[in-house]
């Protein structure tokens, strides 16, 4: 009996350890940034000539457009990324779907509501309706609707989309919603082929497809219910055959973005309640971050799906100036969003950086230590140069709004805003991406002894000291005050302040 009891206790202890390990991996703040759980072996990739991308093809729906970047291009395939841009018109509903790969959504413009349906989580929103029936029957019938939390999104929001989690978006504003989606095909959550697959729960993709600069093709795709037998489906769901046919989307030509004529009737708490809920959610988030950073009893480490998964925040605004990581009043601001600030990114294994450069401001040259980067221009123009390990310029051009540039891991990049300034967002293929700067505070030059710099570049110690310290305490975004005139030194330009 003692042996059996000891065996059961050992099994119980192992289960607790496994449970804690899996939850800590997903939600714990102490994540190793040098480790990136992306699959896919090494392949021969040629990044010797980068190019700026724009959407290659578009699919029109009843109330919007989906634009696809060239997923067959070698640069997208080598980085394991897939990018689309969606435009949802007012009162447009992006029908529920889920994907085989995790992703991030950046709201370029517009506002609306969205829902993410996490499996196994309780329905926390409850609403009662009163339905009036025809004469001769009882005058009204009450029924109650329950569903998971509805989130409101606005311009500048980042939305995390874990693989296999159903979601929908609705435009409740007066202007179109424009959103950029970036998916990670090489994430370990994807156990299918390294290709983006959307599983539609409603609607279809039987719409005409326009190839930019090419011929028109037909894009075909049904929702998941269309593949089931009608009788089996109606029996499984407890509905009649007509409803089952509607679920299958037969003869439905609206596409994947449909128009809701009278608008969605959504249950939302009042503004004061929303603020209170947001505050409680932030407190809970901070609480379990502290919880996993401290030593606790094993029995409290695996305390249920609801606390760690169902209440996790799925949306965060990256354009809020108060959230900026670095700010220079004469150059701009940089905001980074990683799993430390946004724990759900441990599931998605992506991160984002929002950069707002003022007039003629320049970024310190840098490289991405542990991730590829996808740079999308939101406003303005930027002069960009990218250099490979061979010291060759693989990109040298001006990026304009709507263009996307893939910057491979370790390639050095230099960006300078044009006279109207520049705003861009970059998506990184690591939940805790890191960059290494060449100039300014906390840079490579600052970390090196003066003699190392002087001998490496055959310059005097005074020149090496100037090279090491001439940017003072500036970090990231630099004011446009230095212009190289000769090999020996630098001279000041006029310092013009630029407003956002």
From Swiss-Prot:
Disulfide bonds listed in the record: 45-78, 121-310
InterPro entries membership: 11S_seedstore_CS (IPR022379), 11S_seedstore_pln (IPR006044), Cupin_1 (IPR006045), RmlC-like_jellyroll (IPR014710), RmlC_Cupin_sf (IPR011051), Seed_Storage-Functional (IPR050253)
Keyword vocabulary terms for this entry: Disulfide bond, Seed storage protein, Signal, Storage protein
A molecular function (GO) term: nutrient reservoir activity
Keyword Signal recorded: yes
A biological process from GO: seed development
Record bears the keyword Cell division: no
Job description of the protein: Seed storage protein.
Entries under PANTHER family matching the protein: 12S SEED STORAGE PROTEIN CRB, OS03G0336100 PROTEIN-RELATED
Quaternary structure, from the entry: Hexamer; each subunit is composed of an acidic and a basic chain derived from a single precursor and linked by a disulfide bond.
Family to which this protein belongs: Belongs to the 11S seed storage protein (globulins) family.
Name this protein carries in UniProt: Glutelin type-B 5
Source organism of the structure: Oryza sativa subsp. japonica (Rice)
Lineage, broadest ranks: Eukaryota, Viridiplantae, Streptophyta, Embryophyta, Tracheophyta
Gene: GLUB5
């Amino acid at each position: 009996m003692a042996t059996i009891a000891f065996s059961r206790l050992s099994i119980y202890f192992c289960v607790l350890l496994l449970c804690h390990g899996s939850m800590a991996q997903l939600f714990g703040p102490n994540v190793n940034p040098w480790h990136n759980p992306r699959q896919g072996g090494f392949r021969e990739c040629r990044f010797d000539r980068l190019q700026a991308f724009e959407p290659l093809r578009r699919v029109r729906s009843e109330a919007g457009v989906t634009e696809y970047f060239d997923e067959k291009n070698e640069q997208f395939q080598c980085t394991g990324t897939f990018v689309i841009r969606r435009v949802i018109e007012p009162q447009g509903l992006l029908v529920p779907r889920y994907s085989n790969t995790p992703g991030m959504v950046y709201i370029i413009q517009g506002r609306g509501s969205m829902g993410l349906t996490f499996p196994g989580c309780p329905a926390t929103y409850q609403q009662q309706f009163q339905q009036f029936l025809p004469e001769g029957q009882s005058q009204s019938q009450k029924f109650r609707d329950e569903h998971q939390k509805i989130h409101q999104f606005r311009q500048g929001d980042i939305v995390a989309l874990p693989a296999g989690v159903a979601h929908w978006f609705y435009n409740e504003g007066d202007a179109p919603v424009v959103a950029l989606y970036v998916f990670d095909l090489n994430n370990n959550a994807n156990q299918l082929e390294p290709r983006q697959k959307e599983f539609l729960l409603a609607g279809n993709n039987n719409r005409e497809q326009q190839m930019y600069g090419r011929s028109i093709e037909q894009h075909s795709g049904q929702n998941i219910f269309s593949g089931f037998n009608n009788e089996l489906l109606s029996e499984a769901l407890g509905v009649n055959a007509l409803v089952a046919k509607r679920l299958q989307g037969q003869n439905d030509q609206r596409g994947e973005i449909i128009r809701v004529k009278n608008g969605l009737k959504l249950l939302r708490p009042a503004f004061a309640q929303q603020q209170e809920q947001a505050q409680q959610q932030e407190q809970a988030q901070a609480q379990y971050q502290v919880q996993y950073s401290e030593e606790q009893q094993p029995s409290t480490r695996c305390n249920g799906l609801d606390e760690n998964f169902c209440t996790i925040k799925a949306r965060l605004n990256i354009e809020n100036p108060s959230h900026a990581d670095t700010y220079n009043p004469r150059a701009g601001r940089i905001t980074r969003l990683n799993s430390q600030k946004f724990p759900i990114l441990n599931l998605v294994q992506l991160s984002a950086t929002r950069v707002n450069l003022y007039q003629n401001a320049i970024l310190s040259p840098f490289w991405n230590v542990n991730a590829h980067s996808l740079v999308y221009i939101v406003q303005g123009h930027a002069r960009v140069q990218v250099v490979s390990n061979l010291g060759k310029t693989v990109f040298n051009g001006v990026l304009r709004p709507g263009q996307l540039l893939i910057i491979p891991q370790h390639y050095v990049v230099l960006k300078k805003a044009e006279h109207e300034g520049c705003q861009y967002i970059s998506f990184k293929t690591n939940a805790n991406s890191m960059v290494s700067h060449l100039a300014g505070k906390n840079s490579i030059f600052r970390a090196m002894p003066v003699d190392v710099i002087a001998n490496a570049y055959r310059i005097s110690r005074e020149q090496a000291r100037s090279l090491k310290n001439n940017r003072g305490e500036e970090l990231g975004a630099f004011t446009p005050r230095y212009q190289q005139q000769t090999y020996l030194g630098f001279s000041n330009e006029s310092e013009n302040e630029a407003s956002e």
